[in-house]
């Protein structure tokens, strides 16, 4: 393929452990043509190290979302819980149900992993506006180019 996309909340980079993620990263590298591009939008592990645990709320168009972000430092794993309240409905005491564990990666880790697979990062961003990535931004968007074809 000329391009492989991995947008937020997708399966790539959102699995519980390194082994399963590395299988998917390898499939990405093998699927790309020489000179192909891979765009990845994932949560930033470096941000999680310094900002989690935390609780956030987001007022959307139709409702309010309460989120809890827990962090297992030794495993570099996010445990995420969420409760949604629709506007106009009765409010009840939230019971956060623990979601699936998600292994998060830093920019350095992703650069090293994909480098071993023949891809190099050419740009990294904090969001879709083109803002440069940093450890103080929750999202990490990376654009990778293939250097070699992995067989």
Protein language model annotation of sequence segments:
Residues 1-4:
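A short acidic, Gly/Pro-enriched loop at the edge of an enzyme's catalytic core
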Residues 6-9:
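Residues lining the SAM
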Residues 11-17:
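Surface-exposed cleft-lining segments at the edges of enzyme active sites
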Residues 18-21, 53-55:
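Short, glycine/charged-enriched secondary-structure capping and boundary segments
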Residues 20-37:
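A short glycine-rich, Lys/Arg-flanked "PGG" loop and its adjoining helix->strand segment in the class I
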Residues 39-112:
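SAM-dependent methyltransferase
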Residues 104-151:
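C-terminal lobe and adjacent flexible extensions of AdoMet/dcAdoMet transferase-like proteins
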């Amino acid at each position: 393929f000329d391009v492989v996309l991995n947008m937020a909340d997708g399966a790539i980079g959102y699995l519980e452990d390194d082994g399963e993620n590395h299988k998917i990263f390898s499939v990405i590298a093998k699927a790309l043509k020489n000179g192909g591009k891979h765009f990845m939008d994932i949560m930033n592990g470096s941000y999680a190290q310094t900002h989690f645990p935390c609780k956030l709320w987001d007022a959307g168009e139709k409702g309010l979302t309460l989120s809890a972000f827990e962090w297992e430092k030794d495993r570099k794993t996010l445990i995420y819980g969420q409760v949604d309240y629709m506007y106009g409905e009765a409010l009840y005491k939230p019971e956060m149900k623990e979601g699936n564990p998600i292994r998060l990666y830093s920019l350095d880790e992703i650069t090293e992993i994909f480098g071993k697979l023949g891809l190099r990062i050419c740009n990294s961003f904090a969001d879709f506006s083109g803002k440069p990535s940093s450890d103080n931004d929750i999202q990490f968007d990376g654009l990778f180019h293939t250097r070699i074809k992995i067989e």
